[in-house]
């Protein structure tokens, strides 16, 4: 799956339609998706998601995983859902986004991220 949003992102956007190219069973299909198809509000833009450095990126990721930044959580759910779908862990993109949303809202994504941090601190140096 290759995606490109109409607002210039190289990922599925919460602020515009996204063009999708998908290779499945030897056939390439192209189609457009929009946030509303997944029950996600379409934002006027992605300005609130812009970051300037690694620290801001980490802060926004933590906010998304903790559901403290709705826009960040929703763009993570859309793109993680696409990864779940591409990994053949669900029937379609809608189910992938639903699963990603469930994992985010349950706190499991936050828990796994915390475990990753702990693991890397144990193995560092």
Task: State the predicted function of each range.
Residues 1-125:
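Glycine-rich anion-binding loops and their surrounding alpha/beta cores
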């Amino acid at each position: 799956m290759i995606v490109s949003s109409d607002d210039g992102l190289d990922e599925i956007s919460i602020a515009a339609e996204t063009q999708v190219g998908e290779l499945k069973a030897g056939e390439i299909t192209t189609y457009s998706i929009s946030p509303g198809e997944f029950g996600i509000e379409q934002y006027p833009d992605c300005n609130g998601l812009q970051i300037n450095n690694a620290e801001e990126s980490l802060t926004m990721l933590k906010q998304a995983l903790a559901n403290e930044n709705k826009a960040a959580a929703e763009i993570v759910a859309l793109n993680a859902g696409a990864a779940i779908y591409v990994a053949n862990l669900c029937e379609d993109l809608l189910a992938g986004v639903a699963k990603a949303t469930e994992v985010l809202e349950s706190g499991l994504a936050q828990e796994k991220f915390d475990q990753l941090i702990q693991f890397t601190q144990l193995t560092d140096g």
